[in-house]
Amino acid sequence: MKIVILDGYTLNPGDLSWAPLEKLGDLTVHDRTDAHEIIPRATGAEVVFTNKTPLAAETIRSLPELRYIGVLATGYNVVDVDAARTAGITVTNVPTYGTHAVGQMVFALLLELCHHVQHHSSEVKRGRWSQGPDFCFWDFPLVELAGKTMGVVGFGRIGRRVGAIADAMGMRVIAHDPYAADPPGYAEFAFVSMDDLLKQADVVSLNCLLTDENRGMIDADALRAMKPTAYLINASRGG
């Protein structure tokens, strides 16, 4: 069985082993694959793995031996799933690997906005603090999150993780998700409409997959509805 990985470097830059897959068949790993290289490299393969290399309908139809596509990420948006279904090809993803990492990234971005850590670190290294007239040094106001409102759009695994971190930091948490009904045990929590979330939140964290229903939901009107001081963190995925 021929197995092809189209963009292995994004998943394994050298710290993991491909040995388990090598036991299943004739494995070829490409670090990166441009669009014009997909068909030549995948021709004859029964199994193709991709992380971010797109597999469009035309490409899938050009690979008659293909029986399985493994998306090495959560979003299916890089694969034309309808074309794969028509061709009888199974498509799978990895739905839960990034829950904690994405939650952490949301707050890494947010804390940088609140404290400008990189800027102040660079300025301290330049000597501005030691040369300054005061013990305290800052170029921007430092924003405290405790007591502020975190608005989570999309309250699945990642959204709930973001909410849990916000709760631990003393924030009030509100969420909008038309498909979620089970409230968490945070100190302060409420499901609200999207309009109310935009109006109330000091931080809006987008943690949903892209669908036809929510495409373009953060438009000019949505931005105008937010507080002038609010932060918008986009941690969504393509599909």
How should these model regions be labeled?
Residues 87, 95-149, 164:
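Phosphate-binding beta-alpha-beta segment of Rossmann-like dinucleotide-binding domains, i.e.
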Residues 31, 72-73, 89-100, 236:
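Short beta->alpha connector loops at strand-helix junctions that form conserved
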Residues 1-47, 172-174:
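N-terminal glycine-/charge-rich "phosphate-binding" loop or analogous flexible N-terminal tail
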Residues 55-61, 174, 178-239:
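Rossmann-like adenosine-cofactor binding region
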